[in-house]
């Protein structure tokens, strides 16, 4: 008996088809409804007491089973509080604290419950007990001092802070204590606390904040003493000074604010002399800024800037003399130099006259630069020129804040561009965004509308839509999308974004209608212009229906797309969507379970495990969808085979194999692997070759292609055998005729032949017999 799988002669579909929908419907019908708890209605006091007793028994049973679960204690106590039984509530909390006194949420819920019931003294006592047991938990201390301050007990608040400070807490705790004293104008107390704080946390940031505190309260000598204490603590160790560079910088800046420039210079030099240049970048940069403002560094900086100005002027003069087109890179560098000089002067606190002169120089450079209008009408020559206008407008808006001048710059740039030949969307968009920043929304809309009417571009539509969506003007955004589609209905991105807008607005009908219009545009072909990238619209449409869990529509879309293109990637995506459908359904079920099981105590509530029935249902669903995916893979394979697309068949088999490795069995995987082709080397004639040259090439031979070709191969083999037999028969007849002629000639030679002649005749006869035997053997063959 043959062990091979039986050959299927009838490949027609079965008369009764079982679909995945029927399987799911039958499983749903057989599923039993979950049992629901009956609704209780309390009619009188006795029923209420019975209900309370039953609930208490339930809680006590839970605690007996697991008394270490603090969430059960908290729920029990909260329930007693909701019943108005505060004594029982306190008793439960105290029992819980006996079990686990170091559980922070227990203390917090206990104190919150007391404060909710306006039992302030109880809350105080609880906080006192809590900070005694958990002194390292800052949250308890913060709540304790906040309660005391709310009650107006400032001395009590100080006592709590003093108890807290004995534990040397973090810096924020010390700052909270200091802020308390500052709020009640106890600055001397705050200064004393600062001294204790830097003793506990002697880091540079604390020294600086203490000195700033003393400076703000007007005690400048105390501020200097603080910095001197900090420098004494730091010492002259190189590593310590490197970490404390901010202390030296803050000390010098304070002296600068007090106009003690020599003191500040001495501090900078003291630090720079003791630190190498590689480790003193921060101090050196501060010292450079200081000298620029108050020392001789200003003249040095002015000299450097002056030399660079002369260099740029010489380059520009050489370009004008040579008649070469304008080099906008030089103008960019020149304008950047003047802008940096203005910003440096502004940062160092230059006088008003100096700032005005710097602004005047920047404007002069920009005006000279934008006067170099390109002579050609090619967009590539205008691109960098337009960026000069944009930088000029940004300088006026951000640095000088001359908004009227900024608006005039944008208008002049737009008037200069030949919009009939080309336009710059960035220029229009930046102008509109400027008006938005000035809260001139109407002007921004007019600008973008004029841009679209004068020279429509996709970026202009996108920016206009982005503006309206950010302003929540969705109706306006819809109108702009409609205008964009009227202008260019072949743009796939516009269709997709329009539909995504409707989807985000939860208008699925409009989104689906837009996708249908986009697909219809793609299916229209040359008559309607088609789409530049129709696959984007199809993919977005399918993903949309998949997210909406419209499985029938997903299948219908795939079938439509396959009827149109039949690409192997579409087949693969169609097949994999079946198994992805099972994952999506399971995720939806898990989300529904999470919504039902949601509770305030997220950490204490374990995730729900699936029952055996639910697990079996999911497994059954996955198996059904996996079978559907296999059917699609088989359809795809047959389709590609009929179209003789070998490379696409290999790609399909690779995806099919990966699918079976994840979701199939060893049997299904072996079936797919058996379909893989083998590579063979063949020869063929070179195209357009006059001498009939041959070339070798590699071809893919599929097993099922070989099986179908076996019948034709046998017929051809029989034809070759018949032809060979006919040729052998003709050759035998010719040999027989020649041998009979030779025999007659030897007989007429005479009877008086000698014995030698007889021997020769016998040898001839033997040779003839050998020839006859050879012919017979050839005929049989």
Curated annotation (Swiss-Prot):
Key words of the record: mRNA processing, mRNA splicing, Nucleus, Repeat, Spliceosome
Keyword Nucleus: yes
Location(s), subcellular: Nucleus
Biased segments, Low complexity type: 724-755
One family name in Pfam for this protein: HAT_Syf1_CNRKL1_C
A GO BP annotation: mRNA splicing, via spliceosome
Predominant location: nucleus
The UniProt record lists the keyword Translocase: no
SUPFAM superfamilies on file: TPR-like (SSF48452)
Residues in coiled coil: none
Compositional bias ranges of the Acidic residues kind: 586-602, 768-781
GO cellular component: post-mRNA release spliceosomal complex; Prp19 complex; U2-type catalytic step 2 spliceosome
HAT repeats: 50-82, 84-116, 118-150, 152-183, 185-216, 218-257, 259-293, 308-340, 357-391, 401-437, 439-470, 472-504, 506-547, 549-580, 628-665
Annotated region (Disordered), positions in chain: 586-621, 724-781
Functional summary from the UniProt entry: Involved in pre-mRNA splicing and cell cycle progression. Required for the spliceosome assembly and initiation of the DNA replication.
Subunit and interaction comment: Associated with the spliceosome.
UniProt family annotation: Belongs to the crooked-neck family.
Protein name: Pre-mRNA-splicing factor CLF1
Protein source organism: Mycosarcoma maydis (Corn smut fungus)
